[in-house]
Amino acid sequence: MLPKNAIEKIQANVSKPCFWKSLSPGQTWKSKSMRIIPEDFVRRTRGAFEHRVVFSVRWENSWQLWLEREKNELFMIEEDWNEFVDDNHLGPNDNLFIKHDETMNLEVQIFKNNGVEIIDVPLGVEPETEPFHPTPKKPHKETTPASSFASGSGCSANGGTNGRGKQRSSDVKNPERYLLNPENPYFVQAVTKRNDVLYVSRPVVQSYRLKFGPVKSTITYLLPGEKKEEGENRIYNGKPCFSGWSVLCRRHNLNIGDSVVCELERSGGVVTAVRVHFVKKD
């Protein structure tokens, strides 16, 4: 644990609600007690979050953690918390300083017991470990599942021909027929329970050598009937993604299991829009 004077120095100029997490004897970072969000912190944020929080760290990675209440205590869901612990290789000498930013967003700083702050990806952390699956010769008859996204992704996709990247399959036959421009990058998106943002998988990014705009810059969803909706470029768990996806799913009555073809449009080599093609059920 950090010395008291170090804690006071770090908190000296902090006016927003905050709290610390560090290990006590007999605890590990995956102990249930480590998943508790202090009730005092919840009260001071005045209901800014209820169902989930988003942890953001210095190197612009973010983790979405869903919440559940047991009796009078608010817990982060075990799967989400454990992912955050594993991704950051938290150990007995680590201390978390968690500060409310806005609404559900919490800023997390990681300090060692000697007071040194971790300001870059912890050694050995690989933001995304999905393997790259080369596209098979008959992509419309074969599907090769890849490892699932991190908790909260709500995304699965497969690729097409010409070496296109591929993730979990949505079993969409001949997705290229939906494309406005056959040369554009694309992937197939399956709607799942957790669909807050639209992720672009590592295989797709690598296959097309995709580039994205700055974090929080605008991305446009192009919809049938020349309709448009806007989202933002984000990075969660080291993965590029776009906000606004859950709103789009609700507005267009997409249900869990439905699939869409996401065609990426670029300007100057940078992804600027996602053309959304609703897949007709055969």
From Swiss-Prot:
Comp. bias regions, Low complexity: 144-159
Compartments where found: Nucleus
Record key words, sorted: DNA-binding, Nucleus, Transcription, Transcription regulation
GO MF term list: DNA binding
Domain of life: Eukaryota
Classification via Pfam families: B3
Region span, Disordered: 127-178
Principal localisation: nucleus
CDD domains on file: B3_DNA
Gene Ontology cellular component list: nucleus
Known DNA-binding region: 20-114
PROSITE patterns membership: B3 (PS50863)
Alphabetized PANTHER family for the sequence: B3 DOMAIN-CONTAINING, TF-B3 DOMAIN-CONTAINING PROTEIN
UniProt protein name: B3 domain-containing protein At5g25475
Species per Swiss-Prot/TrEMBL record: Arabidopsis thaliana (Mouse-ear cress)
Classification of source organism: Eukaryota, Viridiplantae, Streptophyta, Embryophyta, Tracheophyta
